[in-house]
Amino acid sequence: MEVRYFDNSATTRIKDEVFKEMIPYLSIEYGNPSSLYSIGRSAKRAISEARRRVASLINCSPEEIYFTSCGSESDNTALKGIAYANKEKGNHIITSKIEHPAILNSCKSLENKGFKISYIDVDKDGMLNLEKLESEITDQTILISIMYANNEIGTIEPVKEIAQIAHSHGIIFHTDAVQAVGNIPIDVRKMNIDMLSLSGHKLYAPKGIGALYVKSGIEFERFMDGGHQEKNKRSGTENVAEIVALGKACQIAEKNIEQYQQKLKNLRDYCLNKIQKKIPDIYINGTMERRLPGNINISFKDLNSVELLLRLDEVGICASGGSACSSKEASPSHVLTAIGLPSELSKGALRLTFGDYNTKEDVEYLVENLVRIVEEMRKA
């Protein structure tokens, strides 16, 4: 049975060009980049080129890119690295209630060590209230961390305005852009972002590779002790093959970003229009005005999303009831709870996220089966 994959916010399939470019560094180009001989120097050059490509995608200097193992490590490094480096200046951090668990749990860890965290509410669309954000700032605030785009409902936050508020008070601004990088254009210079997290497997690179952008001049404590790698900020022999893969994925994303963004939007709108016409009693979660181009999050009245997902899986359709990091949890999504969605709707939420390998034929197959399954479940 053919798999129809609609969970590209959870992970993406590695692009053929990306896979091809990384393979030599798992076989013939296996040198340690810290070594002086030729295959070591070759590995070091490959890392430098990948760093340049990642930097180019978000418009920063290559020296401002630090490679990590994933978006979660980048988030942990940003929050804890800034908190510990600035603990003499203050102990207060501001974030939102709809952040990824990597942010929320990092904040909980910091709370256990004496830091104070303010969790800002969002409105029914998942948008942050800027006035409320600014009102929470104190003379002890050292960091504001707000996600660029939400992983469940796709809401794109007013990142540029948040950065302006942070800087007007002399505060560092970090954004978790794991869902945004590669899906929409991002310019850290124009948006005045201080720190940004990204992850390879969300943009057609392998799992196990990520990056953290840190604006030049910002000091942060290292997350891992050991050797000299990543300018003494992230020890451990570099994962050359996956760093190369991330660089290639970023190069492809930069070249095709406008076309790719439009493709996702067209597929999303085509799918949503068909669902709205054929299935009654559905509710769109999040705003359609400021939303990731490939994201649909809808709730079906009187349905359980776990059963719905299992029924879809039986016909080869992969989707999600929320983020992949929380979809197995019995409790309602913290994001849907934060936007005030009633429990009878949050338990029937379905997330569909589109990618480069999706087609209109996939959408037709999805809608045909979704209509049938929802009808059968409601009659049961």
Please give the residue ranges for each predicted region.
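Pyridoxal 5′-phosphate
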Residues: 1-380
